[in-house]
Regions:
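Conserved catalytic or metal-liganding residues and their short signature motifs at active sites
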Residues: 1-196, 201-202, 206-255, 262
Length: 263
């Protein structure tokens, strides 16, 4: 009987020591570790992914911890682990949804091809996947520009933060939504767009602007894109715009190299 009790005590202390080691001893990842937890992952699958990345010591201890803490919801997403942390701290991050975001900087003048490459460089996916959306998903702008053949000109330049759980269409939709917000602020609407909208949107400095008839959104965006490609110097854009609009008024070809892109 004493031998049995001794073995039992040793087992209890052994399990307790193992739990203390797994639960409370901090773990330092070997460099930056990105862990992608996709929607629908079970607690067991999450634990396996964390242990494989060297973020926790034991998947079994993680599962026990999770069960004894009322099975708190663990958020799907991509996580970056690069600092020493206890298992409880790892669990807390997943409960909070402390998801890693990728910053994408889209400068003025970027074409949809440049944007696609920037998205790929940020680690958000393939440039070809983004282009497939940008070149075909016209539904995102069908109310603004029914005749548009792509999203070119409607992917607003800005600094964005995206997660890897967002689809390429989600990313494009965010950029189009930013375009809509700015377009609404400057009065660029399907019925009220004019050449002066180019001044307001920032592609031409304030000052004398070419006169002309009202233009729809598609024509205004196309002209803005041509002017921006023609010169990178803001002070020159008013002159370029004046030349182009005068040519249009006289029904003369623009003779602008960038117009080939937007033909």
């Amino acid at each position: 009987m004493r031998k049995f009790l001794a073995i039992l005590l040793l087992a209890v202390f052994g399990v307790g020591g193992w739990l203390a080691w797994a639960l409370w001893l901090p773990v330092t990842p070997a460099g930056q570790k990105f862990v992608m937890l996709r929607p629908g992952y079970s607690t067991r699958r999450i634990a396996v992914e964390l242990q494989a990345a060297g973020v926790i010591k034991s998947r079994f201890a993680f599962i026990l911890w999770h069960r004894f803490h009322r099975r708190q919801s663990l958020k799907a997403g991509e996580y970056l682990f690069d600092k020493t942390a206890r298992m409880s701290e790892v669990n807390d991050r997943l409960v909070r949804g402390d998801i890693y975001v990728h910053t994408v900087v889209i400068p003025e003048g970027f074409t949809m091809f440049d944007i696609a490459q920037a998205i790929q460089d940020a680690g958000l996916g393939s440039s070809q996947d983004f282009l497939a959306v940008a070149q075909s998903d016209r539904e995102l702008i069908s109310d603004l520009a029914p005749d548009a053949r792509s999203l070119e000109g409607y992917l607003f330049p800005n600094t964005y933060e995206f997660t890897r759980t967002q689809s390429m269409r989600d990313i494009a939709a965010v950029m189009v939504r930013q375009f809509r917000q700015v377009a609404a602020q400057i009065g660029l609407t399907p019925t009220g767009a004019t050449p002066n909208s180019l001044t307001t949107i920032g592609l031409i400095p304030n000052g004398p602007t070419p006169s002309g008839q009202g233009m729809d959104v598609q024509k205004t965006v196309t002209m803005a894109s041509i002017i921006e490609k023609e010169t990178a110097v803001p002070e020159e854009r008013a002159v370029v715009a004046s030349v182009y609009y005068n040519r249009l008024a006289r029904k003369i070809a623009l003779q602008a190299d960038p117009s080939v892109i937007y033909a």
